[in-house]
Amino acid sequence: MIMIRVLFLILILPIKAFALIEVDITRGNLDPLPIAVSPLSIDENSRKSFEKILKQKNIGSEISIVVENNLKTSGLFNPLNKEAFLQAPEIANLKPRFEDWNLIKAQALITGKVNFVDEKLRVEFRLWDVLAGKEMMALAFTTVPTNWRRVGHIITDKVYERLTGENGYFDTRIIYVAEEGPKTRRVKKLAIMDQDGANNKFLTLGNELVLTPRFNPTSQMVTYLSYFRNLPRVYLLDIETGVQEVVGDFPGMTFAPRFSPNGKKIIMSFAKMEILKFTQWI
């Protein structure tokens, strides 16, 4: 079984010590795990269907690239060069020749396949322990074709969790305030992107100032401060539908919103008659 291990050095000194010993730690001792990410195989009919919908020539290879980049940026894995692979993706997914993967020093192997089923994207993937010569995990996902990048992030999460024992973080998004325009007339828009910088899109038009966006920890909702019609108010935005609404009909200015840990309530501040107050959970 593959696990990523960290070796800790414990220095034991006698109680009666008369000299000061200094230990300088100059580098870690954790080497990235060599892992082979085989391109996901795909039949010709599925390839043509996805190319027509997504304008991608080989969606299986594209998903594999997302997984490979995620693993590499984590710093814990060393994805091996695909040019060194000795086994075709469609064969490796059925039964890897572990001696071939051992030759290129791979300790873990990811294989899989992609199919176009009922207008949906179906992805199957497997994680193999090359050293032990056995399967570690096998999962399948079905979703709309446009979610192909997210499938790559989910696969990475599962692999990361299985090999490190820690929760994955790749299937996450970042909400932020984007700025553009000249220095004297900056325009601020609410924006969102994947954790790897892809799928960036604006959620507001920039007609009003937006500040302090906060993600709901349990759903696809965002709360933020907007100066719509020059009146500072806290808003709630559904990322999936684009529907937004004012949070609470309070007089005066509302600001500094934040979700409760369970995502069911919002706490914020409001100012009325020059008196600053804090709301309770609403």
Mark where each language-model region is.
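Multi-bladed beta-propeller domains
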Residues: 194-209, 237-255, 281-282
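Sec-dependent N-terminal signal peptides
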Residues: 4-15
